[in-house]
Amino acid sequence: MSDRLTVLHTSDFQCGKPYLPEAAEALLELAEDIDPDVVIVSGDLTQRAKKREFVTARSIIDGFGARPVVVTPGNHDVPLYRFWERLFDPFGNWRSFAGERALDTVTMVDGAIIVSLNSAAPLRAIVNGRVDDCQVDFARQAFETGERDALRLLV
């Protein structure tokens, strides 16, 4: 394990209106300047969870290059007004962006265990995220089974 881990943590790209491309460009320039070991993006990549917004978000994520990127959805990454989609496939467009990986993830990076929990709760009021007992157990197990001296980060 290295003595130091550099993390670039960001959120709220809000691709779609009011997305600002120059802010994304500045973020990618910052990543080049500080050369983080890992990038963490904690939600709200989109404004309204539309496919075209996820395409824009993907271009930003791809701009981080070969660095590990931990991404978790936020409340804006599930449809708000498309009720049918929100009820029956709230993470459908998210999966077109992120692939079929789980919504809760464990990432190991240079002596660190990073657990990312999805708190977006599409069937609740849009501003009320939730982490349930199963997710807490998921994080606990990941941390307990990891290297004893590993740094532990929860997103």
Task: Spell out what each predicted region is.
Residues 5-6, 38, 113, 150-152:
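Charged active-site motifs of nucleotide-sugar-dependent glycosyltransferases
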Residues 10-11, 38-44, 68-75, 118, ...:
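Active-site neighborhood of phospho(di)ester-bond hydrolases with catalytic His/Asp-centered motifs
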